[in-house]
Amino acid sequence: MDGQGQFAGKVAVVTGGTQGLGEAIARLLVERGASGVVVTGRNRERGEAVAASLGQEGGAKALFVPAELADLGQVRAVVARCDEAFGRVDCLVNAAAITDRGTILDTSPELFDQMFAVNVRAPFFLMQDAVRVMLRERIEGAIVNILSMSSHGGQSFLTAYSASKTALGAITKNVAFSLLPNRIRVNALNIGWMDTPGEHAIQKRAHDAPADWIRDAEAGRPFGRLLKPDEVARAAAFLLSAESGLMTGSLVDFDQTVNGCGDSPAMPRAALG
């Protein structure tokens, strides 16, 4: 099945939809027939351009809603704008997140609070708002939260980030269970190392990586490459569509590692302190 018409007549909200994985998901949903899509992001120029191209190339009505997800007021405006424009929400994808580095020793209270505001609180209230519309309109909707393989424990330099993704995983399961009688499905993807503009930026900013860092990174992976947004978008579309049936409450690992398996012990790169 090529998925054509899979989302015909449906309206989706995709956070982080102005670049990387979020943009790939939004484009795929439109390609597969979505009649409306709302994308969010912080860069207004980029967001307006993505929305315009979704409308011109995909034929859907597309809106960009600028949103700083650390600001709860801006978070709550996202679904409200979608409801105002379309009168419904069928699909929600929480793809936006921050991945700022920090160990148990150097993570500041400010970074910790921002991490949980963007990565946990924002998805929570976006789900709350979307579910309220789904219930009002009697929609058997679907929600996908983008998590991380780091939610299994994570790296020493991603302590708060890993905790935030673990928290969102627990919320995913709780909300999926809570909405069983309403036939609203909630699932998540634990994605691994992915080739996105955001990853390129943080590799240079946080790790002083050279311009060609991805060449060596991909050479060292089992499949000879990092994950690509388009393939993860297809997995998200599966979870959002009728193809996944009654699947709900699942946290799916999407990576080229197998959690809990390895031929050498995992050790931090260096002692802290």
What are these regions (language model features)?
Residues S148:
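Residue(s) in the substrate-gating loop at a strand-loop-helix junction
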Residues T103-I104, L111-F116, A217:
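Substrate-binding pocket helix/loop in short-chain dehydrogenase/reductase
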